[in-house]
């Protein structure tokens, strides 16, 4: 089926960063087959014409690191540093999770992402007490594109660790699909929660199954000091010695990196998921994204979980990301709007290995969102589209969401997720947690 979306301002995020005023795109099944100015196609050659009436059309946003199973933990443990936050609030609460609660929490995260314009995401979930197959089915039913990864920890006995590795390997073999809508990565939590043996086993699983790796790394000064004290190496060098960087790897955070480490990461195709709001809220610091990009590192913007953010609004992340770089470098040209948009779309898609999405171009997957600026004073005058998307817009402005050619949300109404039921169940299950 061919559908033409017409009368829109098209923000392509292609190599030339072209913006087509009064443009159109044609989608055939799941794929964009034409992007142009004006209305120069034969209407009898398409099955449906959708008039967007002046809306802005742009690539769906790509969240490179989050934890949607934690969505019910929003607002838990505010104003705490990372380590005590994890040890005294998050992990104890996650041990109370049931399969039903985890699904309700996941649905809440999916709903929030769709309504705020995210079409693709990379996730890590703690498998304790949950049904991983139910989580994957829930994501699949939402219509979103995702890499959903089972997190590994070295908690408990050596036998517990061995079982965790076996279960993770089964999960990877079951769900890894290179070009599917739903895939996975090998996801050891971090160098401070995984033993050397577990990290080496994760490297083996990734190599044998040709998967990517997703890990928290160099997030805080404390982490760097602790790993250096324990292993005689900084986190980047230590993880490299475990073999994980033999496969394309996404490190979440990368707040505490020196120049040599940035050069090393670029040379080994290690990508960074940048979580500006989460890093600020947990007092972890500010990642030097400008230096990363100059070193040649692929960077994608991310939200982290709602427990440390406290939302999944990628527009907000774009804005704070660019403002932070301008501020810490005292350079107003640092991370300009075009770059910020790329780090939340095309660049982010490359970070998580999904080059089939992230821009409005012929041959790309039909993943896009729209915003109607007409009745929004904060988006007027409407001519400066790129500026407004980064510095003025929010996820609440999103009108329509199309993923893989399918209308997932239209005029603010979700078609694959029951908003009323999801919010009701989220409230019900939250009351069951012993805070």
UniProtKB/Swiss-Prot annotation:
The residue stretches assigned to a coiled coil in this entry are none
SUPFAM superfamilies in the cross-refs? Composite domain of metallo-dependent hydrolases, Metallo-dependent hydrolases
Q: Which GO terms describe its molecular function?
A: 5'-methylthioadenosine deaminase activity; metal ion binding; S-adenosylhomocysteine deaminase activity
This chain's function reads: Catalyzes the deamination of 5-methylthioadenosine and S-adenosyl-L-homocysteine into 5-methylthioinosine and S-inosyl-L-homocysteine, respectively. Is also able to deaminate adenosine.
- Stated name of the protein: 5-methylthioadenosine/S-adenosylhomocysteine deaminase
What EC number(s) has UniProt assigned to this enzyme? 3.5.4.28, 3.5.4.31
Q: Which organism is it from?
A: Bacillus cytotoxicus (strain DSM 22905 / CIP 110041 / 391-98 / NVH 391-98)
Q: Record-annotated residues binding substrate?
A: 94, 150, 189, 219, 304
Extract the InterPro entries matched here: Amidohydro-rel, Deaminase_MtaD/DadD, Metal-dep_hydrolase_composite, Metal_Hydrolase, MTA/SAH_deaminase
User: Which co-factor is required?
Assistant: Zn(2+)
Q: Which Pfam families match?
A: Amidohydro_1
Its gene name is: mtaD
- Cofactor binding remark: Binds 1 zinc ion per subunit.
Q: Which reaction does it catalyse?
A: S-adenosyl-L-homocysteine + H2O + H(+) = S-inosyl-L-homocysteine + NH4(+); S-methyl-5'-thioadenosine + H2O + H(+) = S-methyl-5'-thioinosine + NH4(+)
Q: Which UniProt keywords apply?
A: Hydrolase, Metal-binding, Zinc
Q: Does the keyword Zinc apply?
A: yes
Binding site residues for Zn(2+): 65, 67, 216, 304
Q: Which family does it belong to?
A: Belongs to the metallo-dependent hydrolases superfamily. MTA/SAH deaminase family.
